[in-house]
Amino acid sequence: MLGNSAHFGRWDILQFETAGKTGLTLRYIIGDATRPEGTGPQLLVHVCNDIGGWGRGFVMALSKVSRKPEEAYKRWSAGETDQPFQLGEVQFVYVSEEFTVANLIGQHDIARRNRPTAEPPVRYEAIRRGLRQVRAWAQTRGGSVHMPRIGAGLAGGDWGRIESIILEELVAHGLPVTVYDLIETRGEAPWLPDRSAWPPG
């Protein structure tokens, strides 16, 4: 794993590169995933739950940028589309000509303070199946893939395991992937999340 840091105007970027089978990289930067860097078609991937809940975590920031992903997800969860609403499915929502959001169902239910789950809501195989759909979409359109640390926030997943899935399903197939950490404290290590307690607050 190689580390480099630089200042790029809008963001302080802390970049780590993990070599995939193709020699391409999974890139980490400090920035806002709802406003991906670069040009050309951009696909923003995030993880949703399978009960139709949209109201905590990353989706709140996403809805401030555009309500389209939220509105499409709610129609989907209400059975108003032909696509099955189930783990491993992905809904592609066109926000603008160059920006699409992938609502990937990779979480079963949600964690609640008054009803702890027997295991974290994350479902790794659902994320893997969803990323295969993401791969097909991005390869067809020649786009870049962007995401927060999917499945490792409220879903309670282990990022090391999820990172391996991303490398296998996206990077190893020649897709450029950027992972965003939204961190304000300079020098904090974004790759060392606190997993001391479950469920998350």
Question: Over which residues does each language-model region extend?
Answer:
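Macrodomain-like recognition of ADP-ribose-binding/processing modules
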Residues: L2-G201
